[in-house]
Amino acid sequence: MAKAGSGALRGRYTRWLAALLATAMLVGAGCAQLAEEERELTFRIVPGTASWYDGLPAGVQEADLPVDDGGKTQHIHAWWWPAETADAPAVLYLHGSRWNLTGQAFRIEELHDFGFSVLAIDYRGFGKSDGKLPSETTVYQDARVAWKRLAELEPDAARRYIYGHSLGGAVAIDLAAWLSEQSAKSGAAVPVHGLIVESSFTTLADIAEALTSPWLPMRLLLSQKFDSLSKIRELRMPVLIVHGSGDNYVPSRFSEELYAAAPEPKKLLLVDGATHNNCMRVGSAEYRAALEELFGLEPATADSSAGS
């Protein structure tokens, strides 16, 4: 989720909730149209190319990954940007709402500059991916498909990571919890070395309440839950939680709550003065130090010259 337009989003949420409450009182049940409007409000997809996009970075390989959609094959668009060093860590990048990969390129580049090979995807409905309007279910499915591709690209589980920004943080936590659950059932090691969650929230209802009024029964009204708070308790991997102190869209207290709920090993990095979208840039040195401390990434691996 981007900070821009948070006032307008607050107004849209309030109007949507008023319509939903009126419908519930009149018919005693949910309305398909309102459920669709909820998803539109959750993902707020901006079509086309972001105005600040400078073109596909050199070295990026494009791919389309097949996804089963009820017996019909759809595709999600992906970028694979390998680092220059063969033993570099590899990360699955899961973005938030609004912008497709063209609007995320700057943050993908920052991760690449940290020394990561990066696999980034657009969920169905975003960018060049198939589909129209995503849902909580479809973005979770897309993330799992992308994870399988990352495992093919980087066979060494000790070098695999998951990163999620804002709403993508909820998708990343769901994927990490699912991988933790699968490993617990099988008795095998968790196939990922760590999780990075930046500028995210506890549940969608919590962020909706922050944008509207706390008296509204958001947990009963919303069909899209994105309940990271319960899922993060199930993790079986190190987690780095990052938030900017100046984020006036998603309050940093949500990351503090996620951190409190997460099992060890874990680290909370609050970047002084950073906003919703610039933690890596504003807190670059702190970010690199946190990656080294929690995940054991060598300073040379996370050097800004890597892969540039």
Predicted regions and their residues:
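Primarily recognizes the serine-hydrolase "nucleophile elbow" in alpha/beta-hydrolase
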Residues: 149-153, 158-213, 223
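Membrane-embedded segments
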Residues: 73-149, 153
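Acidic catalytic loop of the alpha/beta-hydrolase fold
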Residues: 246-250, 277-278
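Short alpha-helix in the alpha/beta-hydrolase fold that links the catalytic acid
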Residues: 107, 237, 251-260
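An N-terminal hydrophobic leader/cap segment in hydrolases
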Residues: 28-68
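Short beta-strand/loop motif that positions the catalytic acidic residue
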Residues: 235-236, 241-243, 247
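Post-His helix in hydrolase/transferase enzymes
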Residues: 280-293
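Catalytic histidine neighborhood in serine/cysteine hydrolases
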Residues: 261-277
